[in-house]
Amino acid sequence: MDATRSVYLIDTENQHDWWVGNIKSNTANDKVVLFYSVNSPPVHYELIEKLLMTFSVRQLEFVETYPGKNSQDFFIMNRLGQMIAKAPKSKYIVISEDKGYDPLLWSLTQKGYKAYRHCYKAT
C-alpha cells in the first residue's frame, strides 16, 4: 500500500524555525510550502540546509505573501484550497500557532479531507 502524500504549509510568521526537525518526508511526493513576508523572521542558510537533509529541492516551495492583518493566513488557506482541489487524497498539515485555521480545517475533515493544524514550541 502506498504511503499518503503529506503537504506541510508553514506559517513562518509565528512558527519561526521550530518545526524544522519535526517534519519528515514519507514519500518522494511530499511537499513543504513555506509562506513568508516582511513580518517573518529571516530564512537562514542553516534552515535550508536542514530541510535539504530530509526533502529534495523539488519538494520545497517558497511563497511570498504581502503584509497586512491576517494576510499570510489567507494566502495559506487559498493555497490549501487549490491543492485540495488538485489532490484531494493528500494529507495537509498547516504548521502554525494560529488557532484561527481550526474551524476551516475542522470543516474540511468533516467532508472527508485530511487537513490538520500542528504547532511546535521553541526548545
Model-derived regions: residue spans:
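Generic enzyme active-site microenvironment
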Residues: 9-11, 96
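Short, conserved loop/helix-junction motifs that constitute active-site signature segments
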Residues: 24-29
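Enriched - but not universal
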Residues: 21-22, 109
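Short, glycine/acidic-enriched capping/hinge loops at junctions between secondary-structure elements
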Residues: 19-21, 45-46
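Short linear S-[DN]-x-LW-Φ motif typified by the pepsin-like aspartic protease active-site region
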Residues: 31-33
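Nuclease catalytic cores that cleave nucleic-acid phosphodiester bonds
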Residues: 35-123
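Extreme N-terminal starter segment of soluble prokaryotic enzymes
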Residues: 2-7
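Short acidic, Gly/Ser-rich segments with clustered Asp/Glu that frequently serve as metal-coordination loops
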Residues: 12-20
